[in-house]
Design a protein with these regions (language model features):
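Catalytic domains of carbohydrate-active enzymes, especially glycoside hydrolases
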Residues: 38-50, 95, 157-159
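Alpha-helix-loop-beta-strand connector modules within alpha/beta enzyme cores
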Residues: 5, 57-80, 112-129
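Conserved beta-strand positions in the central sheet of alpha/beta enzyme cores
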Residues: 48-51, 78, 101-102, 125
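Catalytic cores of alpha/beta
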Residues: 72-73, 77-99, 112
Length: 162
């Protein structure tokens, strides 16, 4: 089994949210790289990282932090949050990131997901957040009328594997 320890980031610091609620953000460590190295020492091969600032601002905010973890640890890094364009995906693909997770854009711009899968293959994953069975977007701040299973089936039909 592959365990994916996670580091969510707000203002460059590792945090945890309770049920995706930004009002519950609690800093859990002083340094992202130190946290990642702790996961290495515990035997992790992957780390799941989320740019929570990016998810709210709808753009890459903490991207250099992700790149630093990929460059300075042996971890495979999968990232999500604030990824809205092919240029964002290309940036990560060319800077050592092992997997790019598309979230809100999967619902709001499925054509971009389809293009990304064609260009980058299994580097692309789709993360679907759901509240009460329906897709939630923009860092859990917006709801939708789309059932999460329907979106998952649509993504699978486009060639998304993860």
């Amino acid at each position: 089994m592959i365990i994916f320890p996670a580091i969510d980031i707000i203002d460059g610091k590792p945090v945890r949210l309770f049920k995706g609620d930004f009002a519950t953000a609690e800093q859990v460590a002083d340094d992202v790289l130190e946290t990642a190295n702790g996961f290495v020492q515990a035997g992790a091969e992957w780390v799941h990282m989320v740019d929570l600032d990016g998810s709210l601002k709808k753009e890459r905010v903490n991207s250099q932090t992700f790149v630093d973890v990929a460059a300075q640890t042996p971890l495979k890094v999968e990232i999500g949050g604030g990824i809205r364009t092919m240029a964002d995906i290309d940036f990560y693909a060319n800077n050592g990131i092992s997997r790019v997770i598309l979230g809100s854009v999967a619902l709001k711009n499925p054509a971009l997901v389809e293009q990304a899968v064609k260009e980058f293959g299994e580097l692309i994953a789709v993360g679907i957040d759901a509240k009460n069975g329906f897709v939630a977007t923009e860092g859990w701040t917006e709801g939708s009328d789309t059932h999460y299973i329907d979106l998952a089936k649509q993504m699978e039909a486009m060639g998304v594997k993860t």
